[in-house]
Regions:
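Thiol-/selenol-based redox modules, centered on thioredoxin-like
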Residues: 152-155, 159-203
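N-terminal secretory signal peptides that target proteins for export/translocation
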Residues: 1-9
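Terminal helix/beta-alpha structural elements that buttress the NAD(P)+-binding lobe
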Residues: 51-52, 141, 173, 203
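Structural microenvironment flanking redox-active thiols in thiol-disulfide oxidoreductases
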Residues: 85-150
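Proline/glycine-enriched tight loop/beta-turn segments at coil->beta junctions
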Residues: 69-74
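N-terminal "domain-start" segment that seeds a small globular fold
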Residues: 31-67, 87
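Bacterial N-terminal signal peptides
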Residues: 12-25
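Amphipathic alpha-helical repeat scaffolds
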Residues: 78-82
Length: 203
C-alpha cells in the first residue's frame, strides 16, 4: 500500500543528494567588495579659476554661477544703454546667433563706469536690453569693471590680457580652457574681421 509513495520519495531524494554533493564540492566564490560610490564632480574640479564666481542675472537678480560656461568660448562685454557704441548690441546678438551652436556665448555686464552712460535701475536696463535691443544672450546686473571696487572677474581679465577696459563695449575673448585669447577695444565691432578670426581660432 505504501510502496508507490516510498518509491516516489526515493526518486525525489536522489537529485537532492546529488545537488547537495555538487554544492559542497564547488569552491566558494571570492567575495568582491562593492565599488565605492563615485563622488559628484565639484565645480572647482571642472571649472577654470576665471569662472569660479557668481553674478546676479539681470532680469530677476537670480544668482548665476559662471562655471556653467566652463568649456565654452566666451565673449565678455561691458555694456551701456546710452553710449555711442550701444548699437553694438545688435551686432553682438547676431554674433551670438551665428556661433552659439558651435559653443560661443556672449556675456553682457552693464556698467556705469564710463561717462555715467548706464544710470538706470536693473529693471530699466533689462527692459532696454531685452525689449528695445532684442538681446537674447545672458546679461548680468550692473558691474564695476575698472578702478576701486571692480569685480574680481574684470580684475582677472585685465591682469591676464594686460589691458583694462577704456570705455563701454570692450570685449574679452576667453577660450574653452578659461584662458584670455584676445582683448578688443570698444571700436572693434562684433563683425570686425579681427574679432571673427580670433573666435574661429578658438572654437
Amino acid at each position: 500500500m505504501y510502496t508507490p509513495l516510498l518509491n516516489t520519495l526515493r526518486a525525489l531524494s536522489l537529485p537532492m543528494s546529488l545537488a547537495l554533493a555538487l554544492t559542497c564540492s564547488l569552491p566558494a566564490a571570492a567575495a568582491t567588495p562593492a565599488a565605492p560610490p563615485k563622488s559628484p564632480a565639484t565645480p572647482a574640479a571642472n571649472c577654470p579659476a576665471l569662472w569660479q564666481q557668481q553674478f546676479k542675472r539681470l532680469q530677476d537678480e537670480a544668482p548665476q554661477a559662471l562655471c556653467q560656461y566652463a568649456g565654452k568660448v566666451v565673449l565678455v562685454v561691458n555694456t551701456a544703454s546710452y553710449c555711442g557704441f550701444t548699437g553694438q548690441y545688435q551686432g553682438l546678438e547676431a554674433l551670438y546667433a551665428r556661433y552659439q551652436a558651435r559653443g560661443l556665448v556672449v556675456l553682457g555686464f552693464p556698467s556705469n563706469d564710463f561717462g555715467q552712460q548706464e544710470p538706470g535701475s536693473g529693471k530699466e536696463i533689462a527692459d532696454f536690453c531685452f525689449n528695445t535691443s532684442g538681446v537674447k544672450f545672458p546679461m548680468f546686473s550692473k558691474t564695476v569693471v575698472v578702478g576701486t571696487g571692480r569685480s574680481p572677474l574684470y580684475a582677472a581679465l585685465a591682469k591676464a590680457s594686460g589691458e583694462a577696459p577704456q570705455w563701454n563695449f570692450h570685449k574679452y575673448l576667453v577660450d574653452r580652457q578659461g584662458r584670455v585669447a584676445g582683448s578688443f577695444a570698444s571700436g572693434v565691432t562684433p563683425d570686425d574681421k579681427r574679432l571673427l578670426a580670433a573666435i574661429e581660432r578658438v572654437l
